[in-house]
Design a protein with these regions (language model features):
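Positively charged n-region of N-terminal signal peptides that target proteins for export
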Residues: 1-5
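Mature soluble binding/inhibitory domains
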Residues: 8, 23-151
Length: 151
């Protein structure tokens, strides 16, 4: 009789422990949960470079992009195309889209996709490649300031 009561107590204790631990949220190594991206993830100024080849030869560029956090980006860049330099070339305002998986697209005002983008490190860095026909151009951008710091 005594061992039966002891067995019931052990089973009850084990059941209670199992039920109480089933509501513990998952633990992540960095202490943060997975985060989704949105247009707000790209917010502020980013220094960038681009490198690769175009239908007219090699391309290298560096510049600055300003993201408003609401889906619009503009900037300026200096470019070397096949060894011919052009400085302070404006990048006109255009829309960008961001998916929850932190992939993004740069678009023209008419909606034509011109670049694919991957947002990394919580929006502190971006990787991109050109989708212009004849181009094999990639780039990297790093956050300089948030939009609040740019004002």
């Amino acid at each position: 009789m005594r061992s039966w009561k002891f067995s019931v107590a052990i089973v009850g204790l084990a059941t209670g422990l199992l039920l109480s631990t089933s509501n513990i949220p998952p633990v992540h190594a960095d202490g943060r949960r997975e985060r989704a991206c949105s247009v707000k993830t790209l917010n502020g100024s980013y220094g960038f470079y681009r490198n690769g080849t175009t239908s007219t030869g090699p391309l290298a560029a560096l510049g600055i992009l300003f993201f408003d956090g609401n889906g619009s980006v503009f900037g300026s860049q200096s470019i070397s195309r096949n060894g011919v330099f052009t400085f302070d070339v404006p990048i006109p305002p255009g829309p960008y889209e961001v998916a929850a998986d932190c992939t993004a697209k740069f678009l023209t005002d008419t909606g034509v996709e011109v670049a694919r983008v991957l947002i990394v490190d919580g929006g502190n860095e971006i990787y991109l490649f050109s989708e212009s026909t004849g181009n094999a151009v990639y780039g990297v951008g790093k956050k300089i300031h948030t939009a609040d710091d740019d004002r």
